[in-house]
Amino acid sequence: MEKLLLIGINTRSMLKSALKLDYEVFSTSYFSTSDTPAIKNQKIILEEKDNESSGVFEDNFDSASILDISRDYIDEVDYIIPISGISPNDFTKKDRKKILGNKNTSNIENKFKFYKKIKDEFKVPETFLIKDVDEAIEISENKSDVKYIVKPLKGSGGYNINLLNDDSYIQLNDGEKFILQEYVEGINLSSSVLGSDNYKKTIMNSRLLTEHDFKKNNSYIYIGNILPLTKESILTEIKDIDKINNEMIETSQNLAYTFDLIGSNGVDYILNENGLYVIEINPRIQGTFECIEKSLQINMLDAHIKSCLNENVDIPKAKYYAYKKIIYSPCRNKYSKIDLDNIYDLPHLGTITEKSEPLLTIIDKNSNFDKLYKKVENSAKIVNNEAKKYQQDAI
């Protein structure tokens, strides 16, 4: 039996799909959720303990640590699938040969290289590579009619993105590179693309959700997705949803050919009155993974592997709407059991989650969009209320 390693921030959803396939499965992850399947070959960095804090993800996560504890697994397995938090470029050239997926993503993960490669062919926000905040301010002052955001040269999930304005104070860390990008206000959308050597095809469009969608603040942290993309799930009054879907399908496939994307990948967009802007490519299995599985009723990991091995994959039509919503803790709280049938990525009982850290994920499906939306939003209210019941004093 061939051996498969899943490696990344959280492997729970992929593990469940992998265990249905004919592989000996290995897993290395940062998070240890209580609903993560326990397997023989498994390593987890974050040890959640009763009455102890799980800390702050941004302060504690380091991709190098996951790679370090995975060395023996990497040597032993036949295949590797990097998930979020790990780049193919983090591996040695020898180990990259084992990766099922894109093996070199430098022109994608480097947002300025990505911009330069596609700016003449695709609609993109104007982007600059900056040395410091002073340079960013100088550029913005020369174009006073344009709003800008500052974001890391590399990174995903919407972290460390700041709107540049007169009231903001932005501190750039020494040694870290940033870009200044034209701020495009609009509707966040996403495509999931499957690629092999012989084909590239868009399998699903979705409404991408950030904290800004719900709180109307300047936080762009990823919260979830709703799919498939329809006039209901886009959550905005839109005239021609079919035209938008077709443009996303075509643009995503063209981008997949431009970068020769292999396996499952995501393309993020912003739509406004000026058109559809390409924001970035996520060159790996993305956050829509479970939603697509629920909507299409397929094993998405199997589809990813088959496309990487150049096998044909039949993609059925969507059977359900699916909605994923990550709940970030409303306060510092001690986790207690919540009686809901649609919550995942659960903390261990008695462990402490810091305020604004990911608490759990709500994922559900229904053929009726309104029923699905109401159920997920109701579950979100229950989770937030339960978290507040077990609020802990700040350190």
Per-range role (PLM):
Residues 1-109, 113, 134, 377-378, ...:
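ATP-binding N-terminal substructure of ATP-dependent carboxylate-amine bond-forming enzymes
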Residues 5, 302-395:
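Peripheral (often C-terminal) accessory segments that flank ATP-dependent C-N-forming ligase machineries
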Residues 25-26, 124-125, 178, 323:
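Hydrophobic anchor at the start of a short beta-strand
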Residues 97-167:
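A conserved helix-loop-beta module that forms one wall/lid of the active-site cleft
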Residues 118, 140-163, 176-191, 203-207, ...:
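ATP-grasp fold ATP-binding core
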Residues 165, 195-200, 271-274, 309, ...:
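Short acidic-glycine loop/turn motifs at beta-strand connectors
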Residues 185-189, 193-259, 282-308, 317:
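ATP-dependent carboxylate/phosphate-activation module, predominantly the ATP-grasp catalytic core
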Residues 253-290, 327, 334-335:
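Conserved metal-phosphate-binding beta-hairpin within the catalytic cores
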